[in-house]
């Protein structure tokens, strides 16, 4: 299926940021990136078996002092600009799971007929 260049670029940047974060912060032995196409949606899953983190502390740090967490913030922003959803699940010692769902037909688009 043909994917709009704006979606392809956003997905590339999201995966790039996630893999960079895994490399820099996770101390992971394994990482998995999985992309599926289901019912006019792109589903992106990124998993690692690294050290994990407290998502609330990272979110609070972004808001309180403006440092840290910008990679997660930019991934969220890219997904939201495409009317998608993102779930980031992580706990210290349990690795990280990122699940993203992006509609391939953006608002106002559709099939004729």
Region annotations inferred by a language model:
Residues 1-113:
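Coiled-coil dimerization/phosphotransfer module
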């Amino acid at each position: 299926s043909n994917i709009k260049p704006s979606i392809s670029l956003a997905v590339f940047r999201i995966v790039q940021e996630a893999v960079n974060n895994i490399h820099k912060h996770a101390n992971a032995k394994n990482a998995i990136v999985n992309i599926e196409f289901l019912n006019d949606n792109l589903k992106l899953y990124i998993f690692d078996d690294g050290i994990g983190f407290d998502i609330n502390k990272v979110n609070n740090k972004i808001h309180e002092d403006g440092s840290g967490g910008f990679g997660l913030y930019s991934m969220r922003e890219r997904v939201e600009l495409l009317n998608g959803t993102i779930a980031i699940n992580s706990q210290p010692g349990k690795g990280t799971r990122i699940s993203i769902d992006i509609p391939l037909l953006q608002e106002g688009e559709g099939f004729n007929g």
